[in-house]
């Protein structure tokens, strides 16, 4: 069955016009937006901005940290002075930014409070008593913090006022602690259950991953489901024992509790239903949306050398590492004797007539950097010793093999590792790259190929179901487990006699394919889904 046919088989969601339900309260989990540029953090920001613009929806954000308590905030309905309210909001900002104790005495008190907090979460998971009360946070006095911390990395400034109209609720309980409370219960009784959030007054809570909590009566939980990789490919993830258990146990509990699931691709929906077929009537597919930063208008190729120089990783120091052979530091940028030599090198390496292959992804096993590097080495040896490789992304986990393989090429001036590249600069790289490569062995959606297409780039991708679904006929595909397959795909795109006309055909197809993920295509699907929930839920 094709992706289109499978997509048609999913339950239809009834659409209720906005005027029939003018005050739908939506609480959106913003935890992923506190960190990271791309992927789930980006989609979280874009979705919040898009929903905040819809008439008849009252959208607020849920502020929660992964491993630290969020302090401050004001209890709903509490009588307090303006000064006291601002002070308590300010405490929340401090705790969201990092350490929030002033001396050792407060540190001891904080440690004891954390111990009691964990036992309260266990009690809530076991008994369902003492729901977690959500504190209020008003944006008005902290507009700069909310914009810079949550939205600026993905949302265009033209939407700034739109997102700053919303307020927030604070969950003081760390996400990881809530997960552990449910996992511990599953260890003893064979079935997970989680603490309950006091979500009275909220119609829909949208979580960005399987959520370690239950909601109040009258609130519907919607899980924005990005992938099942922690369960289906646990060998590729970090902190494997915790992430596999937390994902599966929370997902199982969400399914039992009647949650709805918005999957980012039909491939992800199939993975969900392979684990929990009973969720079929409550699982729909709405693809991720692309940010408006990415568009095909011509860029200035002369800016590429400067972009590469500004965003080089330079030095990277791994955390931990017990083996004596582990490096304490990786030098991830080429050395130069003086600034003039450095400037001349980058101007030549990325000047007129230069070619570079681009990959945008966190460095982690599933992304398959090593395979691309092997294929690129073959192309340099056989055909083009001047072909460059640009890797954009943060350094994740299990990265030693990839980084060790990069070091000699970095010093030779053939490979460049970048990070924290803003969207406008990424648009230039996508458009100027000879080809953008997406070699992953597993994905839930994979933004990078669709973003490259939207910028007018040429894409080669691994032949996995989600890439076939998301990229359609606008990419060249290869076997991600076969280096020669990658070589042949890139050779055909770059060096074959018909490479130029083929690239132009792919650019045109990519613009059409990527248009499916523009906000004007995706947001109406979200609105229909949410109105459908308010109007009685999904209808099969």
What are these regions (language model features)?
Residues 2-540:
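Carbohydrate transferase catalytic cores enriched for Leloir-type hexosyltransferases
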């Amino acid at each position: 069955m094709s992706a289109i046919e499978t997509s048609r088989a999913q339950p239809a969601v009834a659409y209720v016009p906005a005027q029939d339900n003018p005050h739908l309260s939506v609480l959106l989990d913003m935890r992923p937006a506190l960190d990271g540029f791309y992927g789930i953090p980006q989609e979280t920001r874009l979705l919040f901005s898009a929903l905040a613009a819809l008439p008849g929806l009252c959208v607020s954000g849920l502020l929660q940290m992964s491993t630290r308590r969020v302090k401050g905030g004001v209890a709903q309905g509490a009588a307090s002075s303006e000064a006291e309210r601002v002070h308590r909001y300010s405490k929340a900002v401090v705790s969201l930014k990092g350490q929030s104790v002033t001396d050792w005495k407060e540190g001891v008190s904080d440690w004891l409070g954390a111990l009691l907090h964990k036992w309260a979460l266990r009690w809530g998971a076991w008994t369902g008593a003492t729901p977690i009360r959500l504190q209020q946070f008003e944006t008005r006095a902290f507009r700069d913090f909310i914009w810079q911390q949550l939205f600026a990395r993905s949302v265009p400034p033209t939407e700034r006022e739109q997102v700053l109209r919303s307020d927030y609720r604070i969950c003081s309980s760390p996400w990881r602690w809530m997960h552990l409370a449910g996992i511990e219960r599953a260890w003893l009784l064979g079935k997970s259950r989680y603490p309950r959030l006091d979500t009275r007054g909220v119609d829909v809570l949208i979580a960005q991953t399987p959520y370690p909590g239950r909601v109040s009566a009258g609130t519907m939980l919607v899980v924005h489901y990005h992938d099942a990789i922690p369960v289906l490919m646990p060998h590729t993830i970090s902190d494997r024992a915790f992430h596999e258990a937390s994902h599966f146990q929370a997902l199982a509990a969400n399914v039992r509790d009647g949650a709805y699931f918005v999957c980012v691709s039909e491939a992800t929906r199939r993975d969900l239903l392979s684990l929990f077929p009973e969720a079929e009537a409550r699982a729909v597919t709405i693809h991720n949306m692309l940010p408006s930063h990415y568009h095909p208008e011509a860029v200035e190729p002369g800016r590429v050398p400067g972009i590469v120089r500004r965003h080089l990783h330079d030095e990277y120091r791994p955390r931990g590492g017990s083996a004596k052979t582990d490096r304490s530091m990786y030098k991830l940028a080429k050395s130069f004797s003086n600034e003039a030599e450095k400037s001349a090198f980058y101007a030549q390496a990325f000047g007129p007539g230069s070619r570079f292959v681009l990959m945008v992804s966190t460095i982690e096993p599933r992304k398959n950097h090593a395979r691309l590097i092997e294929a690129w080495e073959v192309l340099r040896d056989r055909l083009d010793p001047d072909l460059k490789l640009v890797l954009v992304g943060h350094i994740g986990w299990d990265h030693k093999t990839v980084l060790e393989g990069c070091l000699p090429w970095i010093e030779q001036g053939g490979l460049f590792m970048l990070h924290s590249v803003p969207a406008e600069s990424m648009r230039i790289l996508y458009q100027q790259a000879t080809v953008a490569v997406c070699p992953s062995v597993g994905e839930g959606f994979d933004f990078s190929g669709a973003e490259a297409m939207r910028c007018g780039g040429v894409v080669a991708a691994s032949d996995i179901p989600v890439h076939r679904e998301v990229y359609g006929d606008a990419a060249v595909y290869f076997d991600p487990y076969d280096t020669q397959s990658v070589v042949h795909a890139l050779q055909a795109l770059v060096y074959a006699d018909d490479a130029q006309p083929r690239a132009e055909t792919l650019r045109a197809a990519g613009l059409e394919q990527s248009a499916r993920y523009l906000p004007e295509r995706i947001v109406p699907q979200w609105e229909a889904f949410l109105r459908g929930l308010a109007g009685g839920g999904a209808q099969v």
